[in-house]
Design a protein with these regions (language model features):
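The AdoMet/dcAdoMet-binding core of the Class I SAM-like
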Residues: 43-176, 184-185, 200, 205, ...
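Residues that form or flank phosphate/diphosphate-binding pockets in enzymes
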Residues: 40, 74, 192
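Short alpha-helix
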Residues: 188-200
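N-terminal auxiliary segments of SAM/dcSAM-dependent transferases
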Residues: 1-31
C-alpha cells in the first residue's frame, strides 16, 4: 500500500489556498486550491527552463539573473548549478509562506538553494522587477526566467495578459542586457506568445521538456543586437526535447 500524503501546512493567501504535503522526507508537493502545482518527483521542466535560460550567459563575469516564482526551488537550484560563484540571482515570489517552506521542510530537496549567498529573495510581483530594470531603476539582467503557476496561453485577450502579453514581453526585452535570455515555462505551446516574442525583438525557440511526467513547453528567447534583427524576422523556428 502506498504511503499516504501528510499535510504539513495549509496557508490561505490572496491567490487561494496553498498546501504543502509530504510523503516521507524527500517526497513533497505544493498544491493551489487542490491542484498540484509542483512535485519533488516530477520537476524536469523546472530544471529545463533554468538550465536553458542560464547556459548562454553562464560564462559572463558576474551574471545577473531574475527568477519569477520559487515553488519548491528546483529552478533556482538548477540556475545556481549552472552559474558561476560571482552570479547574483534575484527570486521574486509573491507568497512568503512558500519562501518559508523552501527554507524549512523543502530545503532538503534543493540543498538549501534559497540560502545560497548568491541569492536574494524578494516578496514581489516579478513584473514589477522586470519593469524596474526596463526603466533603468535597476541594472539590466543577463537572464530572466519565469517558472510560474500558469504559462502563456492563446485566446482573444492573450495580448493583454499581465504576465505574457505584449507590454510585459516588451518590458522583458528592455530589461535584458545585450544577448540576454528570456526563458519561460508553459503548460502547452502558445503560438500567440511566440508571435509576441518576435514582435518584441527576440530570437526564440520552443523546446519540449519531458521526464517522468507530461511534456511541458519551454520558450528560450534571446535579445539580439539591433543590427542583427533589423530587416528580417527574429524568430527561429527551432524545436527540440530535453
Amino acid at each position: 500500500m502506498p504511503t499516504p500524503w501528510t499535510l504539513l501546512e495549509r496557508a490561505v493567501t490572496p491567490d487561494g489556498v496553498l498546501e504543502l504535503r509530504a510523503r516521507g522526507e524527500r517526497d513533497l508537493m505544493i498544491s493551489h486550491d487542490g491542484r498540484v502545482l509542483m512535485s519533488s518527483r516530477i520537476h524536469r521542466s523546472e530544471l529545463a527552463v533554468a538550465e536553458l535560460g542560464c547556459a548562454p550567459i553562464a560564462d559572463r563575469k558576474a551574471p545577473r539573473v531574475l527568477i519569477g516564482g520559487l515553488g519548491l526551488g528546483f529552478s533556482l537550484r538548477a540556475a545556481l548549478d549552472a552559474l558561476p560563484a560571482t552570479a547574483k540571482v534575484t527570486v521574486a515570489e509573491l507568497n512568503p509562506v512558500v519562501v518559508r517552506w523552501c527554507e524549512g521542510p523543502a530545503a532538503i530537496v534543493t540543498q538549501g538553494a534559497v540560502k545560497d549567498r548568491r541569492v536574494r529573495v524578494v516578496i514581489d510581483d516579478v513584473t514589477r522587477c522586470i519593469r524596474a530594470a526596463a526603466s533603468g531603476k535597476e541594472k539590466p539582467y543577463d537572464a530572466i526566467i519565469l517558472d510560474l503557476y500558469v504559462g502563456p496561453i492563446d485566446g482573444r485577450n492573450a495580448h493583454r495578459h499581465p504576465l505574457y502579453g505584449d507590454a510585459i514581453t516588451a518590458a522583458a526585452h528592455a530589461a535584458l542586457s545585450e544577448g540576454g535570455v528570456y526563458a519561460v515555462w508553459g503548460e502547452d505551446r502558445s503560438r500567440s506568445f511566440e508571435q509576441r516574442l518576435e514582435r518584441a525583438g527576440f530570437a526564440s525557440r520552443f523546446v519540449l521538456a519531458r521526464g517522468g511526467g507530461p511534456r511541458h513547453a519551454v520558450y528560450v528567447a534571446e535579445k539580439k543586437k539591433a543590427a542583427t534583427t533589423r530587416g528580417r524576422s527574429s524568430r527561429r523556428r527551432e524545436g527540440g526535447t530535453v
